[in-house]
Amino acid sequence: MGWHPLGEHGAPHNSSMTQQTNSQGTQPGAAQEQAIFAGGCFWCTEAVMQDLRGVQKVESGYIGGTVPNPDYRSVCGGQTGHAEAVRVTFDPNQISYRDLLGLFFATHDPTSLNRQGADVGTQYRSALFPLTQEQEQTAREMIEQLGTEDVFGRPIVTSIEPASTFYVAEDYHQNYYKNNPGQGYCMAVISPKVAKLRQYYGDKLR
């Protein structure tokens, strides 16, 4: 899978790591695995993950905070410590965790601390919540290599955090882009990411 960043800084240097394939993070013989990604507004992350071949389900939600049963208002108010995130259920025989990581890093700015564009706050932090030791190892290796190769031109601030309870967000947040393609934020922020995803990663889409 060629490396075509979709973040705010344009094209980074070519990265040899994206030519590698790796099944780390998969469970032998498993047809289903889950992974959790936080890359800014969960509407964006959900939209770029939903149509990938091998992805069975994407749920928007909250993770990494200290308050049980958070809701959107409290998370957006910075009162709970949670990040907006998505939980992806996928078939590792069709798409690997490493592939999903590549798309994650390509579709947001992992060098921006607690901010994605105009969305500011710890709830918009770039973070990974590995669910297995294999996922954690793969995530650390990718972050290290992207940093070594200076792919983004600035230090990566993506954190790797313990996978605490994932709280599924309110119903109206699910399938948000598909249900609201004409909404202003969707048109201005999400649609360009989805268009570039189709352009550069068309072979990974259904």
Swiss-Prot record:
Gene Ontology MF terms in the entry: L-methionine:thioredoxin-disulfide S-oxidoreductase activity; peptide-methionine (S)-S-oxide reductase activity
Organism: Deinococcus radiodurans (strain ATCC 13939 / DSM 20539 / JCM 16871 / CCUG 27074 / LMG 4051 / NBRC 15346 / NCIMB 9279 / VKM B-1422 / R1)
Catalytic activity, EC: 1.8.4.11
Disordered: annotated segments: 1-30
Bias kind Polar residues: ranges: 13-29
Enzymatic class: oxidoreductase
Keyword Transmembrane: no
Family assignment from sequence similarity: Belongs to the MsrA Met sulfoxide reductase family.
NCBIfam families per record: msrA
Sequence ranges of Basic and acidic residues compositional bias: 1-11
Catalytic residues (positions): C41
Keyword Oxidoreductase: yes
A biological-process GO annotation: protein modification process
Family matches, as Pfam families: PMSR
Keywords carried by this UniProt record: Oxidoreductase
Record-given protein name: Peptide methionine sulfoxide reductase MsrA
Catalysed reactions, semicolon-separated: L-methionyl-[protein] + [thioredoxin]-disulfide + H2O = L-methionyl-(S)-S-oxide-[protein] + [thioredoxin]-dithiol; [thioredoxin]-disulfide + L-methionine + H2O = L-methionine (S)-S-oxide + [thioredoxin]-dithiol
The protein's role, per its UniProt record: Has an important function as a repair enzyme for proteins that have been inactivated by oxidation. Catalyzes the reversible oxidation-reduction of methionine sulfoxide in proteins to methionine.
Gene3D superfamilies in alphabetical order: Peptide methionine sulphoxide reductase MsrA (3.30.1060.10)
